[in-house]
């Protein structure tokens, strides 16, 4: 019997060997000694006896035995060899009494390499053992900025508090989100009961997930587990979920899992879509314009928040433009979590066809509700999300900020210009850099001092600017109704009273009108294709963003700005075309290439004439952390 099973294991090994070879991959076990020869190691840590997930044991420590095993740890030596005899004896012992002696191995970058016990691992994997007991030594590499290295150090922080090694995530920030969804603080030390409870949930989820997706599901189980928890967080009362409930919830989100498996393909619509052409039968059968009921869900109120004030102006404009055809309702001061869920459910109960959630913080709740209610159109005000069940919308500001930079550069006399930014989120870096490029185009020696209002107060920043003779400052572009201020847009702060020179205008009314028109004219249904997430990112050419230049700006400078604005709106110029330089060197050298919308939105570098950096996570205020958690650029340091 053991000989027959060895031959089965041998065939599995030969198939694995052949597959790896045909794919141009190394067809034997990985050797840790060889990997470490190219790695800076800073420490070793004894982890003691651990339960190691079998799938995470990928190699051997030394090169001596590597050719005896295929990459799946199945044997490659013929069944007459001494190796085969020892393997069969170990196999018989396992069937009779089990393998009790732990292997000795090293853990490096979340993978395990065997020092003693290769045949034990081979037998246990052949028998389908989900885990192997091992005495583990962790090898810790030098910390770097490489994404894989940063992700590993995030895992180390997670392991330090949880002692959990079977959850291996692939995205930066994932472990922080996981802890949040499990209901744990980042520095909370897990108890044995905590570990048992999470393990139980994970095992139940894994069973349901693999029943649906097979033994090789669309994405790794750990990543799917995190996606599941993001939509269905743990019950704070620790009520155990039944497999039937997990299955029902998993089926609702399956399209989102498939989308992630494809690499989260998304499409950014930079211009409103035209209505699809209709033939005679379409006109004859058309029921006419549909009456729409639309909900706006805000996290603050328009009296205290410039952001919400702008959206409320857009909502009122919408009702005015579609009298008798559109009804809107507004929800203010809605908190994340249960209150948001109740609010969205209430909007759906009131027969809303469209729901706008006006902050990136509501993205997760929007997705959760959209999955449960596919007939309702839910849009979140954020940029470049990768979810098929909802769509996102945002104003494209960087082109207008470039024009503001032109004015700042032209008027700057001492080479010092200030820039106040708020959230280090996707799209914001492009605004900063476009402004800096505008400055450089007309004043190559000027520099921009970058400051963050979510780290320091606006008043403190302005005082520092004045003390350092930074007289021209790009301030935030919105005004709070209850706290009006002239510090918006490009401002000259040299005198006692601020002098406004330019302003970038968010025209939310135009944006909402065009979004509603895409629903009414059929462009919504014709846009995009199955399996692609859609994001609306409209700017000056769509009338969603406007740029105002004060008469105080010299006439020739205004003419230059008007010319460049026309070129941008006609598609004849992009601030991010040709050679581009960051603080670290050249970003793009091709004179004939422009950055794509995706590259602009996900920009991670600052222009070479910017003095400053992205803020440290711990320096951000709590409001900013909540936004950055969802839409932040991924090189914000912990």
Predicted regions and their residues:
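Periplasmic-binding protein-like
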Residues: 351-360, 379-381, 469-479, 498-506, ...
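Segments of small-molecule ligand-sensing domains
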Residues: 522-638
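Extracytoplasmic "Venus flytrap"
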Residues: 293-313, 318, 331-337, 425-429
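Short, charged/polar connector segments at secondary-structure boundaries
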Residues: 1-116, 126, 171-184, 214-276
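A short, basic-hydrophobic beta/loop patch
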Residues: 97-113, 119-151
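Flexible loop/hinge segments that line or gate small-molecule binding clefts
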Residues: 371-394
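Hydrophobic alpha-helical segments within soluble ligand-binding/sensing domains
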Residues: 393-415, 505-525
């Amino acid at each position: 019997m053991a000989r027959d099973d060895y031959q089965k294991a041998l065939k599995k090994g030969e198939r694995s060997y052949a597959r790896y070879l045909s794919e141009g991959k190394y067809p034997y076990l990985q050797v840790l000694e060889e990997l470490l020869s190219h790695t800076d190691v800073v420490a070793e840590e004894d982890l003691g006896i651990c339960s190691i997930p079998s799938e995470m044991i990928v190699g051997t420590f030394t090169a001596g035995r590597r050719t005896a095993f295929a990459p799946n740890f199945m044997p490659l030596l013929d069944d007459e060899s001494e190796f085969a005899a020892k393997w069969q004896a170990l196999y018989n012992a396992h069937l009779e009494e089990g393998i009790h002696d732990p292997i000795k191995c090293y853990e490096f970058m979340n993978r395990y390499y065997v020092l003693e016990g290769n045949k034990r691992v081979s037998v246990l994997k052949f028998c389908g053992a989900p885990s192997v007991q091992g005495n583990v030594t962790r090898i810790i590499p030098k910390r770097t900025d490489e994404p894989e290295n940063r992700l590993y150090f995030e895992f180390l922080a997670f392991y330090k508090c949880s002692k959990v090694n079977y959850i291996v995530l692939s995205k930066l920030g994932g472990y922080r989100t996981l802890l949040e969804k499990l209901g744990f603080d980042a520095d909370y030390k897990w108890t044995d009961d905590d570990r048992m409870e999470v393990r139980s949930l994970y095992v139940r989820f894994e069973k349901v997930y693999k029943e649906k997706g097979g033994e090789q599901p669309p994405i790794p189980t750990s990543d799917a587990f995190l996606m599941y928890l993001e939509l269905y967080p743990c019950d704070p009362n620790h009520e155990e979920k039944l497999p039937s409930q997990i299955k029902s919830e998993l089926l609702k989100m399956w399209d989102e899992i498939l989308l992630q498996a494809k690499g989260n393909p998304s499409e950014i619509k930079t211009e409103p879509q035209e209505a699809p052409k209709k033939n005679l039968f379409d006109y004859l059968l058309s029921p006419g314009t549909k009456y729409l009921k639309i909900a706006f869900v805000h996290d603050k109120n328009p009296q205290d928040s410039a952001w919400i004030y702008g959206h409320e102006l857009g909502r009122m404009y919408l009702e005015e433009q579609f009298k008798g055809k559109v009804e809107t309702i507004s929800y203010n001061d809605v908190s994340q979590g249960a209150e948001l869920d109740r609010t969205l459910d209430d909007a759906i109960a009131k027969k809303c066809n469209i729901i706008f959630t006006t902050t990136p913080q509501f993205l997760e709740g929007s997705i959760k509700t959209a999955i449960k209610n596919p007939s309702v159109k839910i849009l979140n005000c954020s940029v470049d999300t990768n979810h098929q069940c909802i769509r996102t919308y945002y104003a494209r500001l960087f082109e207008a900020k470039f024009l503001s930079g032109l004015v700042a550069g032209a008027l700057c006399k001492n080479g010092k210009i200030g820039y106040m930014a708020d959230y280090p989120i996707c799209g914001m870096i492009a605004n900063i850099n476009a402004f800096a490029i505008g400055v450089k185009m007309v004043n190559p020696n000027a520099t921009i001092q970058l400051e963050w209002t979510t780290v320091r107060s606006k008043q403190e920043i302005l005082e520092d600017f004045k003390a350092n003779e930074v007289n021209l400052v790009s301030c935030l572009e919105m005004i709070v109704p209850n706290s009006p201020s002239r510090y918006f847009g490009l401002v000259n702060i040299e005198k006692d009273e601020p002098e406004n020179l330019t302003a970038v205008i968010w025209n939310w009314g135009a944006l909402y009108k065009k979004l509603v028109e895409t629903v009414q004219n059929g462009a919504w249904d014709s846009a995009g294709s199955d399996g692609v997430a859609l994001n609306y990112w409209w700017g000056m050419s769509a009338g969603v963003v406007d740029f105002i230049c004060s008469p105080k700006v010299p006439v020739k400078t205004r003419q230059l700005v008007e010319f460049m604005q026309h070129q941008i709106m006609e598609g004849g110029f992009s601030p991010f075309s040709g050679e581009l330089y960051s603080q670290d060197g050249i970003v793009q050298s091709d004179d004939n290439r422009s950055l794509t919308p995706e590259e602009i939105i996900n920009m991670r570098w600052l222009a070479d004439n910017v003095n400053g950096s992205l803020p440290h996570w711990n320096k951000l205020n709590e409001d900013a952390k909540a936004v950055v958690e969802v839409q932040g650029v991924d090189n914000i340091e912990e």
